[in-house]
Each structure stands twice: as structure tokens, then as C-alpha cells.
Design a protein with these regions (language model features):
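Surface-exposed acidic/polar loop and edge beta-strand patches at domain peripheries
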Residues: 1-164
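Conserved small/polar residues in nucleotide/adenosyl-binding loops
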Residues: 166-168
Length: 168
């Protein structure tokens, strides 16, 4: 547990130590991709707000602990879930959401097309919430959102995701 008074006596703002901030990437195929950039001491991870709140990477003490695929970071594309082209939008990351309708490769079953690893992985979050605050002597960082995979006369699947970190 962090001693709040001692910590605040030596730093001007808690963002020096830990926090979350919404950012937008601005170049290449990632242009326009929004993220909740979390830093917590030696830990850094951006949650991709436009890609199901998946963390694009996790770095600990500057060392990357995750995969970034050849296509690299990128925003939503017209081919994100279209047939074999879908593999061009898989950027990897520290966690990669599969599903919710399917988790296998691209195939057609009973006339229904299922894209590689499902549609949820490229679904932007709604009802996004970000906060960082002291509570009972602990500095907490929270990010949450809701993603929906739905069609008018079909499925209506909702994924609610919350990431919670405590600075120690």
C-alpha cells in the first residue's frame, strides 16, 4: 500500500507516478485510433478504445511483453472482418479478443459467414469510462467500456470489460 501523504510530498501531480489519459494515434494505418494510455510505475499499456479495449502492448520497465504483428497498429478498416483479408487487420497485442460469435478461422456454416476470430475484435467501445483516484490509501486506475456485436434480426451480444489497476 502506498503512503499517500509521503508520495504526494515528493511529487507535484499523481500523473508523474500513475494514471490514465485518452490519446489518439496520428500517423500511418493507426491514424485516428483512440487509446486509454495507462502508466503505473514501471508498467505501461494502451487499451485500444476502437478495438474492443484490447491492450496493444504491455511494457514493464521499458521491455515489451507482447506481440506486434507485421501489419502493426492500425485503426478499423473496411476489410477488418472480410474473408481472408481479415488477417491484414490482426495487429496482435497483449490480449486479442476472439468471438463472440466464433473463434475459428474464416468459414461459411449453413450459409452464414464467420470471419476469422469473429467480429468483436474490431468493435469500438461505447460507454467508455476512465478514472484514477485515491481510495482507502490505494491509488486506483479504472477503464471500462461496452462492445456490441449485433444485427437487426440476429444476434445481440454485449461484452462489458473493466480493467482495474492499483498503484503499489
Amino acid at each position: 500500500m502506498t503512503d499517500q501523504k509521503k508520495l504526494m510530498a515528493v511529487c507535484g501531480h499523481m500523473d508523474q507516478v500513475a494514471g490514465v489519459r485518452q490519446m489518439e494515434l496520428q500517423d500511418g494505418r493507426a491514424a485516428g485510433l483512440r487509446c486509454a494510455m495507462i502508466h503505473n510505475g514501471p508498467l505501461e499499456l494502451p487499451l485500444m478504445l476502437d478495438k474492443c479495449l484490447d491492450p496493444a502492448w504491455i511494457r514493464y520497465k521499458g521491455i515489451n511483453l507482447s506481440l506486434l504483428t507485421k501489419p502493426g497498429l492500425q485503426g478499423r478498416n473496411p476489410y477488418d472482418t472480410a474473408g481472408d483479408e481479415a488477417v491484414r487487420s490482426i495487429m496482435g497485442g497483449a490480449m486479442f479478443t476472439c468471438g463472440l460469435g466464433n473463434v475459428h478461422g474464416n468459414r461459411v456454416v449453413d450459409g452464414v459467414e464467420y470471419p476469422v476470430h469473429g467480429r468483436m475484435r474490431t468493435t469500438p467501445a461505447e460507454k467508455i469510462s476512465m478514472d484514477a483516484f485515491w481510495e482507502n490509501g490505494e491509488y486506483k486506475i479504472l477503464v471500462s467500456g461496452e462492445m456490441r456485436e449485433a444485427q437487426i434480426f440476429g444476434e445481440n451480444l454485449v461484452l462489458r470489460r473493466t480493467l482495474s489497476l492499483i498503484h503499489i
